[in-house]
A protein has these predicted regions:
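Beta-propeller blade termini and top-face loops
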Residues: 22-488
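Bacterial N-terminal signal peptides
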Residues: 5-15
Length: 488
């Protein structure tokens, strides 16, 4: 009886609360408009592409800022999907070589870090980004690759990883022969496994390579790897597939994420970056029939779930690029990756190289997209508004300041009225300590004092009046490790 009375009491209290709840007339918000207050710096990007026929035109997809385009070689960028599509996270970009006005983009993130954004399928433009049409595949949620036939822009392959947090059927390799009006699923492994990488042999577009990745994400951890992680090949445009990952020379045991590339100079030469106990860079010189391991350095395969991307040079069969925290180049067939290409930001995720000029390239990293026209010796700046903030709050300043923690970067506080144009742009915003995924709060009585968190339970206190910052976390040691020189 007591339990029944308690239940009735709770329900009655809930009904009273609902009855007293205020209803807000949404017309009061109709005149409110969004405005950009900054910062003018880039955030994470997973996909990019350029056009062989238009040497100054490039695209990159932001994980939270849509698709961006430049027509002057990366000096100025502009968003081309804002207000035109219903997806803000663009993970795959492909430009048709025969008509650069045709661009396909895929939504969602497939580098499955702890905080990711899902997409809603594939979009297409036929006028260089002025207008867009949704082509379906909405339930894929995370698309890793889009590949356009080199001579027929209506033939397109999509590699879909699928739902990051659960099983679903709309994953695998999809193909269209009518520009995206209809799709056919040509490779499906299981509801638990999607596609991590996909590439077309430029010398014979009927030959396609794909890698399947068995992965499952939770907010607190990720399971990756299993018996369905494999390397696949089709010789008939996706009609049938054969497995290459059990061929002689490939690692035995459980595999994880695999990246794949084929040399445009020699179609028999393949490279794969394989996550496994005996993983590393593997090369085949007979189109996948046999393999040899050429390199197993940790710098190329650390945090495989976040990287595992490899790219063949379009002119030199001995040159291959591997992306990880840093950007590496090999000129001896993948044996040594001793040339590090310096880019404006770390954590590299995608690379497009002009098939007609290997000095022209664009890369995507955790700072956005950047362009090089000299083979990576120099790059354009990443000064566009694609900053990815994990958390935001406001202060009691007048006018109030907006404070946020940026992915793979510092925290930042910006006056809500934006840049006053009365001081240098560099003084527009200020760091308040902490970083990346941490929460921030300012003191209610003194808004110039900030408490900010970061990865690994780090906590700092920052006093803006004297620029003093100090660590105040409960445990004083950085749990991820310290150099031996700093130990007592």
């Amino acid at each position: 009886m007591k339990s029944v009375c308690l239940l009735v009491s709770i329900c009655f209290t809930f009904l009273i609360h609902q009855g007293n709840a205020q209803t807000v007339d949404m017309k009061y918000f109709e005149s409110m408009k969004w405005r950009n207050i900054g910062p003018q710096r880039g955030g994470r990007s997973l996909g990019c592409a350029g056009s062989p026929g238009r040497p100054f035109e490039y695209y990159f997809g932001a994980t939270g800022g849509g698709l961006w385009k430049t027509t002057d070689g990366g000096q100025e960028w502009a968003p081309v999907t804002d207000g035109k599509i219903s997806c803000s996270s663009i993970g795959a970009v492909a430009v048709a070589e025969t008509n650069p006005d045709i661009v396909y983009i895929g939504g969602g993130e497939t580098q499955l870090r702890g905080s990711i954004t899902q997409g809603d399928g594939v979009y297409k433009t036929t006028d260089g980004g002025k207008t867009w049409r949704h082509l379906g595949l909405k339930e894929t949620q995370a698309i890793s690759r889009i590949r356009v036939h080199p001579t027929n822009p209506d033939i397109v392959y999509v590699g879909a990883l699928g739902h990051p947090y659960g099983d679903n059927e709309e994953r695998g390799v999809f193909k269209t022969t009518d520009g995206g009006n209809t799709w056919k699923k040509v490779l499906f492994i299981s509801p638990k496994t999607g596609i991590a990488d996909l590439i077309i042999d430029r010398n014979n577009p009927k030959i396609i390579y794909a890698t399947s990745w068995q992965v499952y994400r939770k907010t607190w951890m990720m399971w990756g790897g299993g018996p369905e992680c494999k390397l696949w090949k089709s010789e008939n445009g996706g009609d049938t597939w054969i497995e290459l990952s059990k061929n002689p020379g490939m690692p035995s045991g459980t595999l994880g994420k695999i990246g794949i590339t084929v040399s445009p100079v020699d179609s028999k030469r393949l490279w794969a970056i394989v996550e496994a106990n005996d993983g590393g860079v593997y090369r085949s010189d007979d189109a996948g029939a046999t393999w040899i391991k050429t390199n197993d350095e940790r710098k190329l395969r650390q945090r495989a779930f976040y990287y595992s991307r490899i790219y063949a040079d379009p002119f030199d069969r001995e040159t291959v690029y591997c992306l990880n925290v840093d950007f590496y180049k090999s000129t001896d067939g993948g044996k040594k990756f001793d040339q590090e290409i310096k880019v404006p930001h770390g954590d590299n995720h995608d690379l497009w190289i002009d098939p007609n000029n290997p000095l022209r390239m664009i890369t995507s990293n955790d700072g956005g997209g950047c362009v090089s026209v000299n083979g990576g010796k120099s790059w354009t700046d990443e000064d566009f508004c694609t900053t990815q903030f994990y958390h935001v709050t406001t202060t009691n300043h007048v006018p109030y300041h907006v404070v946020g923690a940026q992915q793979d970067n510092s925290t930042l506080a910006i006056p809500s009225d934006g840049w006053s144009h009365m001081n240098e742009l560099g003084e527009w915003g200020y760091d308040v300590g902490g970083g990346e995924s941490g929460y921030i709060t300012s003191h209610p009585d003194n808004p110039d004092i900030f408490y900010a968190g970061s990865q690994g339970a780090l906590l700092t206190r920052y006093d803006r009046t004297n620029a003093q910052i100090r660590d105040i976390q409960v445990y004083p040691r950085f749990f991820s490790g310290e150099p031996a020189s700093s130990l007592p």
